[in-house]
Amino acid sequence: MKSAYIHIPFCEHICHYCDFNKYFIQSQPVDEYLNALEQEMINTIAKTGQPDLKTIFIGGGTPTSLSEEQLKKLMDMINRVLKPSSDLSEFAVEANPDDLSAEKLKILKEAGVNRLSFGVQTFEDDLLEKIGRVHKQKDVFTSFERAREIGFENISLDLMFGLPGQTLKHLEHSINTALSLDAEHYSVYSLIVEPKTVFYNLMQKGRLHLPPQEQEAEMYEIVMSKMEAHGIHQYEISNFAKAGMESKHNLTYWSNEQYFGFGAGAHGYIGGTRTVNVGPVKHYIDLIAEKGFPYRDTHEVTTEEQIEEEMFLGLRKTAGVSKKRFAEKYGRSLDGLFPSVLKDLAEKGLIHNSESAVYLTHQGKLLGNEVFGAFLGEL
């Protein structure tokens, strides 16, 4: 096992678009949660053996919503239990610009964290307020500069497009401002309105006014062209990086490789079995105490399912799915398994089917879901 994801489900506030497993941190049993999280790690490793991890990613929620003492407790626990060695190439933490003090940054740096992912979303203060964010544009500059001063040389900025009230001009301003910071990595996602969110409730009432689909496609084109013009290469549908600064942890997912998933609501992929942990914090703590593991669901992945996942995850990468690696992994030819699908998608101009790989065309990136769905139920 080369990768571990750790979920911290606490936030100081809830964003209007977020459907991740998260809770207001006030009145939550945070220390009990951290104790249960440590126990889950210990119990899992007792079963699988000590891993030689290459990547660790702490997400949420908002990991940096923890107090300085709690953040240090988390870092100490990870280093004590997971025992990352010099082979660990990426130790990443998601952070909010408004709660990232110099002291918290020092705690992360001293613990071995070498990559930060800032939830920026937009550099328009009025849009930030509309989507339920509490930070301002100036907070991003302050936190970014502070992180640089403390020695972080790998910073990613998360941005969004297709937001309510967002214009092409807004987006261009946000992308230009983000690029002016000269970060190593940029994730730029289109808004997807998910159930159980503030935006979903507004949409149900006819009160959410989003850019039309054609404009959203134009926004994505702007993102791609500006990144390319700035020398930031696209390596996945929504991700852009300087050479060599791609997210190694996320490439684990897109390459359909296995990983630990620790914490409330976390997903894991261990020994050919996909696991989903319970989401509610109290339920998670109780299950760890009673059973040692917090699984809500486990599913042994069939070979057919693995192959489907290989295609719809792998095609998210600009490099696509390697035919050589596919054959080594599954003992079968990619062209032999999907002859009609590959022919149809190539004729529609959505994929390139070369001798070595299958990958999306420019048009395929715009219609990715159509491409991914074509491989489902074909085996």
From Swiss-Prot:
S-adenosyl-L-methionine 2 binds at residues 61-62, 121, 133, 158. S-adenosyl-L-methionine 1 binds at residues 5, 60, 94. Gene3D superfamilies: Aldolase class I. Probably acts as a heme chaperone, transferring heme to an unknown acceptor. Binds one molecule of heme per monomer, possibly covalently. Binds 1 [4Fe-4S] cluster. The cluster is coordinated with 3 cysteines and an exchangeable S-adenosyl-L-methionine. PANTHER family: COPROPORPHYRINIGEN III OXIDASE (PTHR13932), RADICAL S-ADENOSYL METHIONINE DOMAIN-CONTAINING PROTEIN 1, MITOCHONDRIAL (PTHR13932:SF5). Belongs to the anaerobic coproporphyrinogen-III oxidase family. HemW subfamily. This is Heme chaperone HemW. Its cofactor is [4Fe-4S] cluster. One of its GO terms (cellular component) is cytoplasm. One of its GO terms (molecular function) is coproporphyrinogen oxidase activity. Residues 1-233 form the Radical SAM core domain. Keywords: 4Fe-4S, Chaperone, Cytoplasm, Heme, Iron, Iron-sulfur, Metal-binding, S-adenosyl-L-methionine. It holds the Pfam family Radical_SAM. PROSITE patterns: RADICAL_SAM (PS51918). Its main location: cytoplasm. Signal peptide: none annotated. It comes from the Bacteria.
